Amino acid sequence: MPDSPGARALLTLINTQGLHARAAAVFVRALSGLNVQVLVSWEGRTVNGRSMLDLMTLGAPRGSLLEVQVSGADAEAALAALTKVVENRFYEE
């Protein structure tokens, strides 16, 4: 990641189905309008957190601990938005 403001968090997937298509779409949508780069890591794999398809390739099930790294001007706001989405089970339940 480039040298810019950044933030990092470990987020546990608590929704029933883990990081599936709809959850990935909600995750990406939470970043809309924010000037950030996002990397999401799980079990040794790292993907672009702004890409729904990349997130889906992780196949992370319920209970997975994701490492989320955010950089850019809106890093803190982005991490807060992503944390809210995950903590609210991607608004599924």
Q: What would you call each of these model-derived segments?
A:
Residues 1-3:
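N-terminal acidic, proline/glycine-rich, low-complexity intrinsically disordered segments
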Residues 5-15:
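Short amphipathic
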Residues 19-21, 25-81:
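Amphipathic, hydrophobic secondary-structure cores in small proteins
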Residues 85-92:
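A common structural junction motif
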